[in-house]
A protein has these predicted regions:
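Acidic, polar-rich low-complexity tracts and alpha-helical solenoid repeat scaffolds
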Residues: 1-205
Length: 205
C-alpha cells in the first residue's frame, strides 16, 4: 500500500488535475491510507475528493462511497472519531457535516460503540435536527439508551421524538416530500407512542 500511496500522491499532486482519472486517484489514495490504518489521513483525503466533486472538479460517481469511508475512517479512531471530526470540520464551510455525523454514528452503532454512537447522533441533532435521516438516528438513540439500561432517559427522549416529527414540526415541513423519510419518522413516532404508556404503566405497578 505504501507504493500505491507514493504513486497516487504523484498523480494527485497537480493542482489543476481534474476529471475521472483524477477522481479515481484521489479516491484510491484515501483508500490506501485507510488500508494501512492511517485513518485521520484517509478521512482528510476522502474529504478532499468530496469537496472537489461538489465543486465540479471531479466526477461525483464515488461520492456516496467516499462519504461512507470518511465516516468509517473517523469511527475507527480511538474514541469513535466524533471529537476528531469536530476539530477537523470546525473551520470548514461544507454542507455535509450533518450527513457525516449521521454516518459516524451508524458506523459506531454497528460496532457496538454505543456511547460514541449517541455522541455522534447528538452532534447531528445539535447542528441540524431537520436532517433527512434524523428519525433513524433518534430511533437508534432510544435503542441504545435501553441497551444501556438508561430507562428514564429513554422515556424522556421518546417525548422528544414524538414532538420532533409530528405533522406541525419543522422537520416534517422540510422533508414531507420524501416518502421514505416520512415513513421512518412515522415509525419513530409510533414506536415512541406505544412505549411511553407501557413504561409509565410498568413504573406505576
Amino acid at each position: 500500500f505504501r507504493d500505491a500511496i507514493s504513486a497516487y500522491n504523484k498523480v494527485t499532486g497537480f493542482q489543476n488535475l481534474t476529471g475521472k482519472e483524477a477522481a479515481l486517484a484521489m479516491y484510491h489514495l484515501a483508500e490506501s491510507y485507510y488500508n494501512i490504518a492511517e485513518f485521520e489521513t484517509a478521512a482528510v483525503k476522502y474529504f478532499d475528493y468530496i469537496v472537489g466533486a461538489d465543486a465540479g472538479k471531479y466526477p461525483s460517481d464515488l461520492r456516496a462511497e467516499a462519504m461512507d469511508f470518511m465516516a468509517a475512517a473517523f469511527s475507527d479512531l480511538e474514541g469513535g472519531g466524533v471529537e476528531e471530526a469536530e476539530t477537523f470540520l470546525k473551520d470548514k464551510k461544507v454542507s455535509f457535516k450533518d450527513s457525516l455525523y449521521y454516518r459516524i454514528g451508524m458506523k459506531n452503532k454497528d460496532h457496538d460503540r454505543n456511547e460514541e454512537a449517541v455522541q455522534s447522533f447528538r452532534r447531528l441533532m445539535a447542528i441540524n435536527p431537520n436532517y433527512i435521516d434524523a428519525p433513524l438516528a433518534d430511533i437508534a438513540i432510544v435503542e441504545i439508551l435501553i441497551l444501556q439500561q438508561k430507562f428514564d432517559e429513554a422515556q424522556e427522549y421518546r417525548y422528544t421524538v414524538v414532538k420532533r416529527y409530528d405533522r406541525n414540526s419543522s422537520w416534517y415541513k422540510k422533508n414531507q416530500q420524501y416518502p421514505a423519510s416520512v415513513k421512518n419518522a412515522e415509525s419513530a413516532i409510533r414506536s415512541a407512542m406505544l412505549d411511553i404508556p407501557q413504561y409509565d404503566h410498568a413504573q406505576a405497578a
